[in-house]
Swiss-Prot record:
Keyword hit for Transcription: yes
Residue ranges of every copy of the HTH cro/C1-type domain listed in the record: 128-183
Transmembrane segments: none
Database matches in InterPro entries: Arc_TR_HTH, Cro/C1-type_HTH, Lambda_DNA-bd_dom_sf
Protein name as annotated: Putative HTH-type transcriptional regulatory protein Saci_1344
Record-linked SUPFAM superfamilies: lambda repressor-like DNA-binding domains
Keyword annotations from UniProtKB, A to Z: DNA-binding, Transcription, Transcription regulation
Organism whose genome encodes this protein: Sulfolobus acidocaldarius (strain ATCC 33909 / DSM 639 / JCM 8929 / NBRC 15157 / NCIMB 11770)
Pfam families, per database record: HTH_3
DNA-binding region ranges: 139-158
Length: 305
């Protein structure tokens, strides 16, 4: 069984400054914390051999997540039960064995993520797009070679994703192993994610506020929704309009729009999609949605009247 001393020795061999936390004597959530080094290596918050009851395990995970949010550090549980070269994740906290930690500290890529659904491979979205464009390969061509939808490939390139081992092997065969990502290096703390989510939320509010202003000026009655597929409805006389904004990924946006279309068809309303950019609007138009980009919201009233 790996010990705190084992981990400390590994950190020392890699010239990483660390402190062992000795309080409390039992039921600790943090055993070791490291120091950030020249912005090249993030802070690590480590718990060693977390073989605790489910209830205490939840509390330990919660503590690790909280300090990660405050420091933008990487929370890690060092667990002998995890296979070599594999990372397990629960509630935003990673688990790996000592060998995998050693490989990561040497700068080697750690790209296998184990979940309840199986083992998946991290993809580097920027590198994937770069390699595809170098080969002058379209999204459609790549999707056919991978055996996935064009929307899936678009999402792979938009945001670092996890793919099946089968898809990863095909990507390596086509582009080389540069397109494979690194779970540890690419880790975003919850703080950063929250900032990104808040930014997305603020952008959605901005879109809906502008839309509401344009429609109200044209004498439409508007209502907003928070917990369904549609974001806003507008009524003027017998005319009924339903509006949807984009969400975090293209695939989720299309799912949202398709569900909103079910509502629109049942109440005899016209569904209008508001896209953030002309690039995504073209994708939605190919799926036969009526689309306006944010800068053209003023045209909604003119073309609906």
């Amino acid at each position: 069984m790996v010990t705190i001393s084992d981990v400390a020795n590994l950190l020392s061999r890699n010239t990483i400054n660390y402190s062992i936390i000795d309080y409390p004597e039992k039921k600790k959530s943090i055993d070791i914390i490291t120091e950030e080094q020249n912005d090249k290596r993030r802070i690590l918050v480590l718990k060693i051999n977390n073989s605790t009851s489910d209830r205490r395990n939840f509390r330990i995970l919660f503590d690790l997540k909280k300090i990660s949010e405050v420091t933008e550090s990487l929370p890690l549980i060092i667990d002998d039960n995890i296979e070599d070269d594999v990372v397990s994740e629960k509630d935003g906290v990673f688990s790996m064995n000592l060998y995998t930690l050693e490989r990561s500290l040497r700068g080697e890529k750690i790209f296998l993520l184990k979940t309840r659904g199986g083992i998946f491979v991290r993809v580097d979205s920027k590198k994937l797009r770069e390699k595809r464009e170098e080969k002058n390969m379209s999204l459609g061509e790549l999707s056919q070679r991978l055996g996935v939808s064009r929307i899936s490939v678009y999402d792979y390139e938009k945001e670092d994703s996890y793919v099946s081992i089968e898809v990863a092997e095909k990507l390596i065969e086509i582009f080389g192993d540069e397109v494979i990502g690194d779970i540890i290096k690419d880790y975003d703390s919850n703080t950063k994610k929250k900032k990104e989510l808040q930014s997305d939320y603020n952008e959605e509010v901005k879109i809906l506020e502008k839309l509401d202003r344009v429609l109200s000026d044209a004498n439409y009655k508007t209502v907003k929704f928070n917990f369904t597929a549609i974001d806003m409805a507008a009524i003027k006389g017998s005319e009924k309009l339903i509006f949807c904004t984009e969400v975090n990924t293209l695939a989720n946006s299309l799912k949202k729009f398709n569900e909103a279309n079910k509502i629109a068809s049942k109440i005899n309303a016209k569904l209008l999609v508001i896209a953030k950019s002309s690039k995504t609007s073209k994708v939605y138009e190919k799926e036969n949605f009526n689309v306006y980009i944010y800068n053209d919201i003023d045209k909604v009233v003119d073309e609906s009247s």
